[in-house]
Amino acid sequence: MAAVVLENGVLSRKLSDFGQETSYIEDNSNQNGAISLIFSLKEEVGALAKVLRLFEENDINLTHIESRPSRLNKDEYEFFTYLDKRTKPVLGSIIKSLRNDIGATVHELSRDKEKNTVPWFPRTIQELDRFANQILSYGAELDADHPGFKDPVYRARRKQFADIAYNYRHGQPIPRVEYTEEEKQTWGTVFRTLKALYKTHACYEHNHIFPLLEKYCGFREDNIPQLEDVSQFLQTCTGFRLRPVAGLLSSRDFLGGLAFRVFHCTQYIRHGSKPMYTPEPDICHELLGHVPLFSDRSFAQFSQEIGLASLGAPDEYIEKLATIYWFTVEFGLCKEGDSIKAYGAGLLSSFGELQYCLSDKPKLLPLELEKTACQEYSVTEFQPLYYVAESFSDAKEKVRTFAATIPRPFSVRYDPYTQRVEVLDNTQQLKILADSINSEVGILCNALQKIKS
């Protein structure tokens, strides 16, 4: 079992699956230079007391400690600790004592981003808990130019939503929210205005699923749907699920969630003074823009392919994948017969840009990921150009082809039964995959024979 040490915001792990490969994760949440140490102990009387005694004997200042049952060994508990940065000179001997004298399993990590390192990535859906609260902006705090910056009631409300997201853990139902009348009015304005455009501007997949969301998830002008209801609906359609988040995540963390068919979703709504504008993703953007397409099997698979491609990818490729995501999932157009329709959530949740993108003003180019990945884009204005996909299936194959160019010493696949990402870097893993494929092919052949007869 791997152990984890986090020092000065840099986390890296040796993965037994990668031989001598090392992985790292950069994280700026720990600004005081403290060292984070994760270790596991057998569930027995006095086990933690031995560790605390070891720290005391070596004059180590323990500033924070959390515990939880181990997800890998039901007979152990995991402890997450912060140690004073002055611990560094004796850290090696402490880890040795934890292992040899106390019998702890220490999650050991390299503390440098070295050559041939692989960025850390979640291997289980539960590990999304590790970074879900490491938001880059907004959350409970607002920039001075935010429409709600000077509104103390709105800021307090945002803190309530942020607290829900911070306290959420995988497997829990998403807490239900009683939205205010003002919030419902804001939603109603956005809902009514956008719905009028969908029939002529949105893609078939969006228009096909939208009535089902109205029927089963409470998508109405006078009602803001609950994330838990929508998440349950998504799981029955494509296996995607929603997870509340307080604000913007890093590209690596956000894309990593997609690999597990998890969409990090905001629960708050934009400020009522500007119902047709938001400087950040809000529940209008998430539910009206993203959710209908995540309910489509082909689009869900396409989105997951982007997420899987991001796992263990170098930083420069994360930037490319984030750009691909921007020009597809957020601002993508697709062919539909002789017409072009919008499928990007940024378009489907913006009244102005949804009209603009299908006018003669922007430039339209075919989706070529090698070029798309390097294209600059604006986050404050309408896009000067959009990329047009032939179909979601075609876009999915292009993502797979692009993923093959990413320099990483392994391939990955998602196992929906265990909700784990499997690293395919040895013959045993490949044999398991081959057996799985063989079983599926057998089912296919059997079904074809019955259809013919």
UniProtKB/Swiss-Prot annotation:
One of its GO terms (biological process) is tyrosine biosynthetic process, by oxidation of phenylalanine. Pfam families: ACT, Biopterin_H. Its cofactor is Fe(2+). The keyword Signal does not apply. Keywords: Acetylation, Allosteric enzyme, Iron, Metal-binding, Monooxygenase, Oxidoreductase, Phenylalanine catabolism, Phosphoprotein. Phosphorylation at Ser-16 increases basal activity and facilitates activation by the substrate phenylalanine. The modification Phosphoserine is found at residue 16. Pathway: Amino-acid degradation; L-phenylalanine degradation; acetoacetate and fumarate from L-phenylalanine: step 1/6. Fe cation binds at residues 285, 290, 330. It comes from the Eukaryota. GO terms for molecular function: amino acid binding; identical protein binding; iron ion binding; phenylalanine 4-monooxygenase activity. Signal peptide: none annotated. The modification N-acetylalanine is found at residue 2. It catalyses: (6R)-L-erythro-5,6,7,8-tetrahydrobiopterin + L-phenylalanine + O2 = (4aS,6R)-4a-hydroxy-L-erythro-5,6,7,8-tetrahydrobiopterin + L-tyrosine. Its EC number is 1.14.16.1. The keyword Cell membrane does not apply. Transmembrane segments: none annotated. N-terminal region of PAH is thought to contain allosteric binding sites for phenylalanine and to constitute an 'inhibitory' domain that regulates the activity of a catalytic domain in the C-terminal portion of the molecule. Residues 36-114 form the ACT domain. Homodimer and homotetramer. Belongs to the biopterin-dependent aromatic amino acid hydroxylase family. Catalyzes the hydroxylation of L-phenylalanine to L-tyrosine. This is Phenylalanine-4-hydroxylase.
